[in-house]
């Protein structure tokens, strides 16, 4: 990141591009990368604009805890404006980027253009289904609060449906959770599911034993 920040200056800009005004750095994305870039520019001789389609910064490493009902969404989200409130040279725009006019040096939103001298694109990454895009229709990613609350609803609903079922095979199916991906998020989610089943839900049901739930 420090190497990136070093390149955000007026080097290579023509006098017409800067003139007598302050350099304007536009950052698309208010995730870890975008906010780190913005805060590194706190003392810079220029103005910073952060654009994001959501008004909050999300601590994604703890999304699995929201998905398993250990935390609420508010516990892992903070207002972007609040984070940058004391940074005098920073401005925040809530909006979705529809395009970039490279020649005209402008970021395009639905109803406005935001001119820039330097542009940082920090929009993050999407889920990978390892070449099996059909999985997207039957599963949920874990990148946003909406993803986490959807997953939480599905998990808790599976226990409820298992409680209502008289079919042992149906119960087994409902209490089996498949996790695609064995990285930190996948491993932590599997552990949190086990904790949910064996501790939080262990005594909540009459007809099923939540501790028999399995993840793979």
What feature does the model see in each segment?
Residues 2-23, 90-178, 196-201:
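FAD-binding core/adjacent interface of flavoenzyme oxidoreductases
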